[in-house]
Swiss-Prot record:
SUPFAM superfamilies: ATPase domain of HSP90 chaperone/DNA topoisomerase II/histidine kinase, HSP90 C-terminal domain, Ribosomal protein S5 domain 2-like. Molecular chaperone. Has ATPase activity. GO terms for molecular function: ATP binding; ATP hydrolysis activity; ATP-dependent protein folding chaperone; unfolded protein binding. The gene is htpG. It comes from Pseudomonas fluorescens (strain Pf0-1). Its main location: cytoplasm. Keywords: ATP-binding, Chaperone, Cytoplasm, Nucleotide-binding, Stress response. PANTHER family: HEAT SHOCK PROTEIN 90 FAMILY MEMBER (PTHR11528). This is Chaperone protein HtpG. The lineage of its organism: Bacteria, Pseudomonadati, Pseudomonadota, Gammaproteobacteria, Pseudomonadales. Residues 560-634 are annotated as: C. GO terms for cellular component: cytoplasm. Belongs to the heat shock protein 90 family. It is found in: Cytoplasm. SMART domains: HATPase_c.
Length: 634
C-alpha cells in the first residue's frame, strides 16, 4: 500500500451516528443484506461510468471489461468487494460516506416498523445502504479513485462505525472502489466462498454485469496455492432482455426489489417487447405499498432508462403520466440516442408514442389485477387510490379506462371502505336509472347521515359517498361513465327522472304550488343568506336542507382554495324545506314575523351544520336557540 498523505479525522454527521447505532444494534437478524446493498451500490457505480464514458471514452482507461469482484480471507477475517466503476474522489468520499440528507434519515427513522426483516430492507430505499456494512464489520476500509483522475489522487476512508472516520490521500493505480470489511467476532461465516456465493445468487443474480468470486480450488498437499482464478457466479444478463418464458417469478420479484429498494414483492408486473416501427423492451411493476414520498411532487419518480442495454438515467419521468408515478420498472429503447437528455425526452415524438403505449399497458395490468385479484386490488386502492384520482384530469385519452379503475364508498356499505367500482354500481342500479348519483363531503360519518340521501334511501337507490379532499375536483373532470351521467345529489334541482312516477311528480308540483306563500316569507326572512328558497324533493325526515347552485363550488373545493390562500368565489346556497315536516307546518302557521324570522334562521343554520359547513355567526345561532328554549320551557 502506498504512503498516505493529507490524513485527517472527521466526525460523522449526527444523523449518520444515529443510523450506525441502528444498523449495529437493530438489524442483526438479517445480516446477509449487507452484501446485497454493497453490490447494488457497485452496480450503480458501474452504470454511471458506462454512461459518462459515452461522452468521454478515456474514462474507461485500460479496463473496458466492467465487473464486480467479491473475495474473502478466512485468516484475516475479511470480506472484500471491488468494482471498476466510476469511483470517488476525496470530496465524494466525505460527502457520500460521512453525511446523508437529513430528510432521508428522518424519513428512514419514521418508517421503521420494529420488524427487523422489514426494516433491514428499508435501508436501500433511503440511500443509506453502505452503512449496512457495519452490521457484520467492526471496521470498514474504503479505497477509491475516480475515473479520469491521476493515480496519485486515490483516497482511503476508514471507520470503526463509532463517532468518526479517517480520510487520507493514497496512490491507487486502478480506478473504482474497493471495500474491505473486517468482520466482527462471531461473523466469520461470511468469510466463506459458498456462503457468499449463495447470498449473491439469492439477492443479486439479476445484476446485469458479472459478479466474480475466486474459484474454489484446493491445493494438493505440498504444492503452493494456485493463482486465483475468477468465475462469474450470477447470471449477468439484463433480465428484461430475456424471453418471458425463461424468467421465473422469483427472478422478477428480486429484480423489482433491486430497482425499487422495496422489501415486499410487487403486486403485479408486465414484461413486454415491442418490435416494428418502434423497438423497445419494458418491465413495469405495481408496488404492494406506497413509498413514503408519494405525495411530494418533487420526489424522484419515473423509470430506469436504458438505450441498447446501456444505462442512461434513473427516474426518467417522461414515459408515464404523473398519476402513475408509483410505477417502478425499466424501459430499454433501440430508437433513442445514447446522449439523450431529460430536455430531449420531453420533446421527442418517439417518447410520446412510448408513453401512450406504456400508460395503456399499466392500465391494462391494473384492470387485470382488479378483475382477477379483487382482494389485492383493494390493497392497491388503499395505497394508491388518491393518486389514481388525479388521472381523469391529466389523461383525457384514457379517462373512461381510469374511471373503470376508480373505487368509492357507497350507501350500500357500512364502514366507508372504498370498494365500489362504477361498473359494479351500474350493474345493480335500479331499473330505469340512467344516472350515477354521488355526494361529496368531509367524512364518511357526515355524508352517510346527510339529509341529501333521504329520498334515495326511501327509494332504495345507491349513492356513491366521496370523502377524499380530491373528490369534488375529480368529479369536475368526470361527466359520464358508460353513457350514464354523474349527478351530485346536493347540487341544483334534483331530478330523479324515470325513478319518479308521474303521480309523484304531479303531487310534488301541487305541494310546491300550495307552499308559494311560505316560500316568499322565507325569502324575506333569510334575505341575502340564500340564492333561492324552494320546496324540497330530497327530504323525507329532515325539516330543511342547503343545496348547492349548479355552477357553484362545493364545500370541499372551497376549503381547498381557502387552505391554499386563494380567493373563494362568492356563492349562496339554495334553502329547501320539507313541506310535510311538523316544524315546517308550525313555521307556516307562525303569525309573529319576529318569531318566524328566528325559527327560519335556526333551520338555516342547522341545515348548514348538517351539510358539514361552519356557521358564519355562531353567536347569533346560539342566541336564537336559547331564546327558543326559554320560550318552550316557560
Amino acid at each position: 500500500m502506498s504512503v498516505e498523505t493529507q490524513k485527517e479525522t472527521l466526525g460523522f454527521q449526527t444523523e449518520v451516528k444515529q443510523l450506525l447505532h441502528l444498523m449495529i444494534h437493530s438489524l442483526y437478524s438479517n445480516k446477509e443484506i449487507f452484501l446485497r446493498e454493497l453490490i447494488s451500490n457497485a452496480s450503480d457505480a458501474v452504470d454511471k461510468l458506462r454512461f459518462e464514458a459515452l461522452a468521454k471514452p478515456e474514462l474507461l482507461e485500460d479496463g473496458a471489461e466492467l465487473k464486480i469482484r467479491v473475495s474473502f480471507d478466512k485468516d484475516a477475517k475479511t470480506v472484500t468487494l471491488e468494482d471498476n466503476g466510476i469511483g470517488m474522489n476525496r470530496d465524494d468520499v466525505i460527502t457520500h460516506l460521512g453525511t446523508i440528507a437529513k430528510s432521508g434519515t428522518a424519513d428512514f427513522m419514521k418508517n421503521l416498523s420494529g420488524d427487523q426483516k422489514k426494516d433491514s430492507h428499508l435501508i436501500g430505499q433511503f440511500g443509506v445502504g453502505f452503512y449496512s456494512a457495519f452490521i457484520v464489520a467492526d471496521k470498514v476500509d474504503v479505497y477509491s479513485r475516480r475515473a479520469g483522475t491521476a493515480a496519485s489522487e486515490g483516497v482511503h476512508w476508514s471507520s470503526k462505525g463509532e463517532g468518526e472516520f479517517e480520510v487520507a490521500t493514497i496512490d491507487k493505480p486502478e480506478r473504482g472502489t474497493r471495500i474491505v470489511l473486517h468482520l466482527k467476532s462471531g461473523e466469520e461465516e461470511f468469510a466463506d466462498g459458498w456462503r457468499l456465493r449463495n447470498i449473491i445468487k439469492k439477492y443479486s443474480d439479476h445484476i446485469a454485469l458479472p459478479i466474480e468470486l475466486p474459484k474454489e480450488v484446493a491445493a494438493a498437499e505440498g504444492e503452493e496455492k494456485p493463482e486465483v482464478e475468477w468465475e462469474t457466479v450470477n447470471r449477468a444478463s439484463a433480465l428484461w432482455t430475456r424471453p418471458r418464458t425463461e424468467v421465473k417469478d422469483e427472478e422478477y420479484q428480486e429484480f423489482y426489489k433491486h430497482i425499487a429498494h422495496d422489501f415486499e414483492n410487487p403486486l403485479s408486473w408486465s414484461h413486454n417487447k415491442v418490435e416494428g416501427k418502434l423497438e423497445y423492451s419494458s418491465l413495469l411493476y405495481v408496488p404492494a405499498r406506497a413509498p413514503f414520498d408519494l405525495y411530494q411532487r418533487e420526489a424522484p419518480k419515473g423509470l430506469k432508462l436504458y438505450v441498447q442495454r446501456v444505462f442512461v438515467m434513473d427516474q426518467a419521468e417522461s414515459f408515464l403520466p404523473l398519476y402513475l408515478r408509483f410505477i417502478k420498472g425499466v424501459v430499454d429503447s433501440n430508437d433513442l440516442s445514447l446522449n439523450v437528455s431529460r430536455e430531449i425526452l420531453q420533446k421527442d415524438p418517439i417518447i410520446d408514442s412510448m408513453k401512450s403505449a406504456l400508460t395503456k399497458r399499466v392500465l391494462d395490468m391494473l384492470e387485470k389485477l382488479a378483475k382477477n385479484e379483487p382482494e389485492q386490488y383493494k390493497g392497491f386502492w388503499k395505497n394508491f387510490g388518491q393518486v389514481m384520482k388525479e388521472g381523469p384530469a391529466e389523461d383525457f385519452a384514457n379517462k373512461e379506462k381510469i374511471a373503470g379503475l376508480l373505487r368509492f364508498a357507497s350507501t350500500n356499505g357500512t364502514d366507508g371502505e372504498q370498494i365500489v367500482g362504477l361498473a359494479e354500481y351500474l350493474a345493480r342500479a335500479k331499473e330505469g336509472q340512467d344516472k350515477i348519483y354521488y355526494l361529496t363531503g368531509e367524512t364518511y360519518a357526515q355524508v352517510k347521515n346527510s339529509p341529501h340521501l333521504e329520498v334515495f334511501r326511501k327509494k332504495g337507490i345507491e349513492v356513491l359517498l366521496l370523502t377524499d379532499r380530491i373528490d369534488e375536483w375529480l368529479m369536475s373532470y368526470l361527466s359520464e361513465f358508460d353513457g350514464k351521467t354523474f349527478v351530485d345529489v346536493a347540487r341544483g334541482d334534483l331530478d330523479l327522472g324515470n325513478l319518479d312516477s308521474e303521480e309523484d311528480k304531479k303531487a310534488a308540483e301541487e305541494v310546491a304550488k300550495s307552499k308559494e306563500g311560505l316560500v316568499e316569507r322565507l325569502k324575506t326572512a333569510l334575505g341575502d343568506s340564500v340564492a333561492e328558497v324552494r320546496v324540497s324533493h330530497r327530504l323525507t325526515d329532515s325539516p330543511a336542507i342547503l343545496a348547492i347552485g349548479e355552477q357553484d363550488l362545493g364545500l370541499q373545493m372551497r376549503q381547498i382554495l381557502e387552505a391554499s390562500g386563494q380567493k373563494v368565489p362568492d356563492s349562496k346556497p339554495i334553502f329547501e324545506f320539507n313541506p310535510s315536516h311538523p316544524l315546517i307546518e308550525k313555521l307556516d302557521n307562525e303569525a309573529s314575523e319576529d318569531r318566524f324570522s328566528d325559527l327560519s334562521h335556526i333551520l338555516f343554520d342547522q341545515a348548514a351544520l348538517a351539510a358539514g359547513d361552519s356557521l358564519k355567526d355562531p353567536a347569533a345561532y346560539v342566541s336564537r336557540l336559547n331564546k327558543l328554549l326559554v320560550e318552550l320551557s316557560a
